Regions:
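Zn-dependent metallo-beta-lactamase
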Residues: 1-16
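Structural recognition of the beta-strand scaffold that forms the well-ordered cores
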Residues: 11, 19-21, 46-50, 70-74, ...
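Divalent metal-coordination and catalytic microenvironments
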Residues: 12, 22, 37, 52, ...
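Active-site metal-binding motif and surrounding structural segment of the metallo-beta-lactamase
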Residues: 15-17, 28-72, 167-170
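Metallo-beta-lactamase
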Residues: 17, 25-26, 75-113, 116, 118-183
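Binuclear metal-ion centers of metallo-dependent hydrolases, dominated by the metallo-beta-lactamase
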Residues: 183-200
Length: 200
């Protein structure tokens, strides 16, 4: 959780509506985000998937649920959200799940413990887009950020599983700061290997 820093999310516009990944953590941004999406695309948000239990991903789940948006997390994320008094989703995923929505197909993937014990990524196989959330850091980062709930010894192995699953991504969207460099996953793995060495 740590210090507040700018956070990225992602949404996908389809003929059936907009799918959003993660919520803002600033309560004043919950409705303005919906309004700006509606104004720009003339579509409503119909689904939101949060990628782990920290507030920068889950804070808006309850608000969006009351707005009629289908909200999703994994069962593990829900357990941790409940334990830590965070907002919870309406629908729970028991395993990696493929969603076919409009013309898009994407998969939620749990690669193992890293930033948190429940962090998932979202992989668009056809478009080669990886939404890495807080598990992946930008190339300008010198460390892996907040590690208060991290598995320091498993982080590198988890990132290797992401590499094997999500091959040759064209875009990697990360949770914080600039996401435009395609080498963020490789850079994060280097940082995670260093972290593991320092914690052996």
């Amino acid at each position: 959780e740590g210090t507040q820093v700018p956070a990225n999310g992602m949404y996908v516009v389809t003929p059936k509506g907009v799918v959003m990944f993660d919520t803002p953590w600033d309560t004043t941004q919950f409705q303005p985000l919906l309004d700006s999406i509606s104004l720009k695309h003339h579509k409503t948000v119909v689904m939101c998937i949060a990628t782990h239990w920290h507030s920068d991903k889950t804070a808006g789940l309850e608000y969006y649920k009351h707005r009629g948006i289908k909200t999703y997390t994994t069962i593990l994320t829900d357990e941790l959200s409940k334990k830590n008094d965070k907002k919870r989703a309406e629908f729970l995923m028991a395993k990696d799940t493929v969603f076919n929505f409009g013309q898009y197909s994407f998969e939620t993937y749990y690669p193992g413990e890293g930033h948190t014990s429940d962090n998932i990524v979202v992989w668009f196989e056809n478009e080669k887009i990886l939404y890495g959330g807080c598990l992946i850091k930008g190339v300008d980062e010198t460390d892996l950020g907040y590690l208060g709930d991290a598995n320091k010894k498993e982080y590198a192995s988890t990132l290797k599983r992401v590499q094997r699953k999500c091959r040759n991504p064209k875009f990697i969207i990360i949770a914080h700061n600039d996401w435009k460099n395609i080498h963020s996953l490789k850079h994060s793995l280097m940082l995670a290997k260093k972290l593991k060495r320092n914690n052996n």
